Curated annotation (Swiss-Prot):
It comes from Rhodospirillum rubrum (strain ATCC 11170 / ATH 1.1.1 / DSM 467 / LMG 4362 / NCIMB 8255 / S1). One of its GO terms (molecular function) is protein dimerization activity. The lineage of its organism: Bacteria, Pseudomonadati, Pseudomonadota, Alphaproteobacteria, Rhodospirillales. It catalyses: NAD(+) + NADPH + H(+)(in) = NADH + NADP(+) + H(+)(out). Belongs to the AlaDH/PNT family. This is NAD(P) transhydrogenase subunit alpha part 1. It is an enzyme of class 7 (translocase). Pfam families: AlaDh_PNT_C, AlaDh_PNT_N. NAD(+) binds at residues 127-129, 132-135, 180-182, 202-204, 234, 247, 266. Residues 126-136 are annotated as: RQD loop. The transhydrogenation between NADH and NADP is coupled to respiration and ATP hydrolysis and functions as a proton pump across the membrane. Keywords: NAD, NADP, Nucleotide-binding, Translocase. GO terms for biological process: NADPH regeneration.
Length: 384
């Protein structure tokens, strides 16, 4: 079987869905690996390194994709309306595995059905123990949380750790993290390593212990409401108006003392909740920084702008998009390993063919299109 990895064409995307290590694993499984020329440049992965691992380099995307049985990408393929029609380049009946953004990008899903492409949206991977090694959201969010702190430290005009000198003492930076998921936990850990005093808030009561285990202080809002603020899949629920008001009041007491606020709160399939209002920004210290990791989903702060750094009311608000791509050299191998871990159990060792087992919940939970039809319950109206 042939597996192809094209160059990512969406603006600002430096990641690639392959690494030399994963090429070797795929070859060992019986795959012929075809990578588009220059696909790994943004992630510091050279064509020579991929060739040495066993891959074949194709000069164009069309050459790489035209005969491939399986296609790996980081982001969803582009449609004709977006410019280069990547969907049309994929062989009819092929298998696609990528971050499809299926719940919010219906046009590309419909375009895939027309070519009878079996598409797996890796962002829909079930939150079960067995699937942790396949979870692209966790691997990429972890790096985003790290990078958020580094970006915050860069934009902040002061030092992070406390420094005692003959000329005086420099106080430690105060960091406030909103949302204690994978990104939030890594942000807490990284900020603590840099010497900051770290506070954190989340609607889920279970995150309090996690925050404290990393040396942070948890801001409690409403104990009773927080006990039911988590979905069966482990995600945060959208909270009511009364809770949000209480949360804003509790957080504001810390926000006025905060140097760097990092917001990471997302609700699957819905706009990001507003956690820092414009009124709250006006009460922050001059020179403080907000890093909004949810800017692509509408933002946790309404003043953040996708892809821009703006200054409002004396506060610098950073809206970098696609933050994992800012750590592409580490993000790419992890993404590729997630895809490999998803694919490997379904390769028949005797025939060297890919047979996706539909009874496997990692398969049924991520399969969006099959046999020319949209099959995922969240898109057919049969489930959430």
């Amino acid at each position: 079987m042939k597996i192809a990895i094209p160059k990512e064409r969406r603006p600002g995307e430096d990641r690639v869905a392959i690494s030399p290590e994963v090429v070797k694993k795929l070859v060992g499984l019986g795959f012929e690996v075809i990578v588009e020329q220059g696909a790994g440049v943004g992630a510091s992965i050279t064509d020579d390194a991929l060739t040495a691992a066993g891959a074949t380099i194709a000069s164009t995307a069309a050459q790489a994709l035209s005969q491939a049985d399986v296609v790996w990408k980081v982001q969803r393929p582009m449609t004709a309306e977006e410019g280069t029609d990547e969907v049309a380049l994929i062989k009819e009946g092929a298998v696609l595995m990528c971050h499809l953004g299926a719940l919010t990008n219906r046009p590309v899903v419909e375009a895939l059905t027309k070519r009878k492409i079996t598409a797996y949206a890796m962002e829909l991977m079930p939150r079960i123990s067995r699937a942790q090694s396949m979870d692209i959201l966790s691997s990429q969010s972890n790096l985003a949380g790290y990078r958020a702190v580094i970006d915050g430290a860069y934009e902040f005009a002061r030092a992070f750790p406390m420094m005692m000198t003959a000329a005086g003492t420099v106080p430690p930076a105060r960091v406030l993290v909103f949302g204690v998921g994978v990104a939030g936990l890594q942000a807490i850990a990284t900020a603590k390593r840099l010497g900051a005093v770290v506070m954190a808030t989340d609607v889920r009561a279970a995150t309090k212990e996690q925050v404290e285990s990393l040396g942070g202080k948890f801001i409690t809002v409403d104990d009773e409401a927080m006990k039911t603020a988590e979905t069966a899949g482990g995600y945060a629920k959208e909270m009511g108006e009364e809770f949000r008001k209480k949360q804003a009041e509790a957080v504001l007491k810390e926000l006025v003392k905060t140097d760097i606020a990092i917001t990471t709160a997302l609700i699957p399939g819905k706009p990001a909740p507003v956690l820092i209002t414009e009124e709250m920004v006006t009460k922050m210290k001059p020179g403080s920084v907000i890093i909004d990791l949810a800017v692509e989903a509408g933002g946790n702060c309404p003043l953040s702008e996708p892809g821009k750094i703006v200054v409002k009311h004396g506060v610098k608000i950073v809206g970098h998009t696609n933050v994992p791509s800012r750590v592409a050299a580490d993000a790419s191998p992890l993404f590729a390993k997630n895809l490999l871990n998803f694919l490997t159990p379904h390769v028949d060792k005797d025939t060297k063919t890919l047979v996706m087992k539909l009874e496997d919940e990692t398969v049924s939970g991520t399969c969006v299109t099959r046999d020319g039809a949209i099959v995922h319950p969240a898109l057919t109206g049969q489930g959430a």
